[in-house]
From Swiss-Prot:
The gene is serS. It comes from Coprothermobacter proteolyticus (strain ATCC 35245 / DSM 5265 / OCM 4 / BT). This is Serine--tRNA ligase. GO terms for cellular component: cytoplasm. InterPro entries: aa-tRNA-synt_IIb, aa-tRNA-synth_II, aa-tRNA-synth_II/BPL/LPL, Ser-tRNA-ligase_type_1, Ser-tRNA-synth_1_N, SerRS_1_N_sf, SerRS_core, tRNA-bd_arm. The lineage of its organism: Bacteria, Pseudomonadati, Coprothermobacterota, Coprothermobacteria, Coprothermobacterales. PROSITE patterns: AA_TRNA_LIGASE_II (PS50862). Its EC number is 6.1.1.11. NCBIfam families: serS. GO terms for biological process: selenocysteine biosynthetic process; seryl-tRNA aminoacylation. L-serine binds at residues 231-233, 285, 384.
Amino acid sequence: MYTLRFVRENENLMREALRKRQYDESIVDQLLAVDEQRRKEVTSLQELNTRRNELTSVVSKKKKDGTDASQEIELLKKLKEEVSVKETIVSELESKIQEILKQLPNIPHESVPTGKDSSENVEVRRWGEPRTFAFEPKPHWEIGENMNILDFQRAAKISGSRFVAYQGLGALLELTLINFMVWTHVKDHGYTFVIPPYLVKSDTAFGTGHLPKFKDEMYYCPEDDLYLIPTAELPMVAYHSGEVLVEAELPKRYVAYSACFRREAGAAGRDTRGLIRRHQFNKVELIKITKPEDSYNELESMVSDAESILQLLELPYRVVLLCTGDMGFAAAKTYDIEVWMPSYGRYVEISSCSNTEGFQARRANVRMRRPDGSNDYPHMLNGSGLAVGRTLAAIMENYQREDGTFDIPQALRAFMFA
């Protein structure tokens, strides 16, 4: 989140960022117009307070001298009412300014390509070769249902559409993948494992940038003012909220497992079948808190950490740099990792890794203390390491046999039966 002062001093930069992101830059005009009105009202309020103070002195002097001050007292009463009204106006304008500031997205990093949507994202690299099948590859949901390891019908009976029940080998594989991912990130990459709460307060969701923009995409418990998390990013960004971290403690690297809950309103097409787009799914999330000067190197290593899971599982994938029009609200730069899905005939997103720079740190009030004693905002990074259900779907499709079953990757097999 940016301050009013920052927008005033960097108006052209903010306008350019909004244009690149396909946002309406008139929001800046609206903000500056409200600010101009606020400043006029503040000046008027200051003048009223000056007159009130002067009149108070006159009343005090007349009372001390024993002279009649009734006329001044009546004027003072009216002035106090005017001041009260003016203070309310100023307060309402300040609240309006804050609401507008909350709607401003992060400014894209200079290395992010300008584009209007996903069609203008830039492929960075590929790993592995998609397998050539001697038969028509089946979609993972058919494989799962035929093997009786994914049950969509009973899940729908229990909860409605776009839920799944894992059973038997399916449940065992889902759990094994979670453990495999977490253990790899802890043992090989130096992350600290956290299992966070799955329900968060409004302030927590605001810190990541999910509120107010994405309110309608989250499940909400109004009696408790708690949201079911769409990703462990929410509780983990808030993990150090209100704290001042010592620079020497950075970077902090966390790997968090959680169930995730998303309304997915408006989702349609092939992705709504199977495990790709569920209302509830499991995900392993990577979070970093870094010094500003180190954050882009840390972003590259985070992407590499997420890639390593796919490499160990020998799943073909590609890395894509998102353009300005396709990035998330809080991101300054984002890489997507997309895994090859044979039945789709294309790559499908399985991880998104972003540097939010100081944007989330400011919203969540996470600060760092430099060696000279000054305070700064650290940079916060997040990424999937990986989406578990999508990883299982990719295994089922890429390792499928002609008889409708599938092999288990060697790395996972050794881990599974350890």
